UniProtKB/Swiss-Prot annotation:
HAMAP family: RRF
Record NCBIfam families: frr (TIGR00496)
Main location per the UniProt record: cytoplasm
Species this protein is from: Pseudomonas putida (strain W619)
Gene Ontology biological process: cytoplasmic translational termination
Gene Ontology CC terms, in alphabetical order: cytosol
Function description: Responsible for the release of ribosomes from messenger RNA at the termination of protein biosynthesis. May increase the efficiency of translation by recycling ribosomes from one round of translation to another.
Keyword Protein biosynthesis in record: yes
Pfam families documented for this protein: RRF
Subcellular location: Cytoplasm
Annotated protein name in UniProt: Ribosome-recycling factor
GO molecular function, one term: ribosomal large subunit binding
Upper lineage: Bacteria, Pseudomonadati, Pseudomonadota, Gammaproteobacteria, Pseudomonadales
Length: 185
């Protein structure tokens, strides 16, 4: 029972870390990275498709992404989708290849993205703490129902707190790395 609660808490906290990683990856830095375009949807074959399903996105150099459409007829739609996205990117097309240069970040945009990253990290911490709260409530219920002793509850609560501290430290480390990346000129 206690192990099930701890395992569930660890799994849910791990999912919060994974979500944090995805959210931080979508925040643009000065460097080109294919995940920047993950949010771009392209009108293709009668529906909105994610860009990575209709084209191959690769890094050409440190500041340029190269996009090759799987279907050459989609090149114009891909270019338009990137232009109309709220990413502030300006693609240029050369036949079936689309190049997306990454504009240099101004000090103001760097600080804005750092604030955004901080908010994402704080949301992840809140999610981890909510998991801890749920796990502690489950332990209290087991104690109340006399399924475990108070000593076992206290021991398990300490282990869950250590788990929470470990995941919060991971979140802080991920944020610090992203912040360093954003503030590097």
């Amino acid at each position: 029972m206690i192990n099930d609660i701890k395992k569930d808490a660890q799994d849910r906290m791990g999912k919060s870390i994974e979500a944090l990683g995805r959210n931080l990856a979508s925040i643009r830095t000065g460097r080109a990275h294919p995940s920047i375009l993950d949010s771009v949807k392209v009108p293709a074959w009668g529906s909105e498709m994610p860009l990575n399903q209709v084209a191959a996105v690769s890094v050409e150099d440190a500041r340029t992404l190269k996009i090759v459409a799987h279907d050459k007829n989609l090149s114009a739609a891909i270019e338009k989708a990137i232009l109309t996205s709220d990413l502030g990117l300006n693609p240029s097309s050369a036949g079936t290849t689309i190049r997306v240069p990454m504009p240099a970040l101004t000090e103001e945009t760097r600080k804005g993205y750092t604030k955004q990253a901080s908010a994402v990290a704080e949301d992840a911490k809140v999610a981890v703490r909510n998991v801890r709260r749920d796990a502690l409530a489950d332990l209290k219920k087991l104690t109340k129902d006399k399924e475990i002793s108070e000593d076992e509850e206290r021991r398990a609560a300490d282990e869950i707190q250590k788990l929470t501290d470990k995941f919060v430290a991971e979140i802080d480390a991920a944020f610090k790395a992203k912040e360093k990346d954003l503030l590097a000129v």
